[in-house]
């Protein structure tokens, strides 16, 4: 399964967090769960389309009762902000018109674009659009990621590579990319290059190392201790083997001690 499923969804709740942070159990039109899911999808599509040149890595959406918070992680924050914040105001006004609520727009800079899989995929797609040979684009992205500190990278291109009449797929890989290890910190990105021969799909996996034991246990404890869940019953089972005999021995030692004084007072 690790070879086929999206690495982000496969590790959701383990090493990855949700990118839509809200809850809805309302039956009112416009506030239902499906309405918010559709609205989140529209927000991401509009932002990816309008800010395509800005190199948007990911968009995180949080909702309150009367406000929507949108966090944009980008490699070029200057393009998103614009001159004197004009572009940011335009984006905010567009989102407020789409959602009908007050929008709080936050812009974060991605400092190391060579280790961001989505930005790497976009970079390769831009080079393919500019008619750079696909092998050269893949090799350059691979070298930049390894120099930036990645422990492994895997790149896949699918389509009419080099203008060939028959579409095919090609892989480039360097280092380790353990897709089935849940504690592995793997970033995944996908983008489509629009060329004169058609669209070419670009997929990128970047392995950044494993989550440490302390970080993993801390994150699991936070999930197991959520209110309304019984996740905390799993880990203590190992300790219950030694706890059971202690509970059985305790009454045997205490029962005679309590019975002896009671008999003496009656006499």
From Swiss-Prot:
Gene3D superfamilies: 3.30.300.20, Ribosomal protein S3, C-terminal domain. GO terms for molecular function: mRNA binding; rRNA binding; structural constituent of ribosome. Residues 241-267 have a biased composition (Low complexity). It comes from the Bacteria. GO terms for biological process: translation. Residues 43-111 form the KH type-2 domain. SUPFAM superfamilies: Prokaryotic type KH domain (KH-domain type II), Ribosomal protein S3 C-terminal domain. Residues 216-267 are annotated as: Disordered. Pfam families: KH_2 (PF07650), Ribosomal_S3_C (PF00189). Belongs to the universal ribosomal protein uS3 family. Part of the 30S ribosomal subunit. Forms a tight complex with proteins S10 and S14. Binds the lower part of the 30S subunit head. Binds mRNA in the 70S ribosome, positioning it for translation. This is Small ribosomal subunit protein uS3. It comes from Bifidobacterium longum subsp. infantis (strain ATCC 15697 / DSM 20088 / JCM 1222 / NCTC 11817 / S12).
């Amino acid at each position: 399964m690790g070879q086929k499923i999206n690495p982000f969804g496969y590790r959701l709740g383990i090493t990855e967090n949700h990118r839509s942070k809200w809850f809805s159990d309302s039956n009112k039109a416009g506030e239902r769960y499906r309405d918010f899911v559709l609205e989140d999808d529209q927000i991401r599509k509009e932002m990816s389309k309008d800010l395509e040149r800005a190199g948007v890595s990911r968009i995180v959406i949080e909702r309150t009762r009367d406000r929507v918070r949108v966090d944009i992680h980008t490699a070029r924050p200057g393009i998103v902000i614009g001159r004197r914040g004009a572009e940011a105001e335009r984006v905010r006004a567009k989102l407020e018109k789409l959602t009908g609520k007050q929008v709080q727009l936050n812009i974060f800079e991605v400092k190391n674009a060579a280790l961001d899989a989505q930005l790497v995929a976009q970079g390769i797609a831009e080079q393919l659009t500019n008619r750079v040979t696909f092998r050269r684009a893949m090799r350059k992205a691979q070298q930049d990621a390894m120099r930036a500190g990645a422990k492994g990278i895997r790149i896949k291109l699918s389509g009419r590579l080099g203008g060939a009449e028959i579409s095919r797929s090609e892989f480039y890989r360097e280092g380790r990319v353990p897709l089935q290890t849940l504690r592995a910190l793997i970033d995944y990105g996908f983008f489509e290059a629009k060329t004169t021969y058609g669209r070419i799909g670009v997929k990128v996996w970047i392995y950044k190392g494993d989550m440490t034991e302390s970080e993993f246990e801390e994150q699991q404890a936070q999930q197991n201790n959520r209110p309304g869940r019984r996740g905390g019953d799993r880990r203590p089972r190992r300790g219950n083997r030694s706890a059971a005999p202690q509970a059985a021995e305790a009454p045997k030692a205490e029962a005679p001690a309590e019975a002896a004084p009671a008999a003496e007072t009656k006499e």
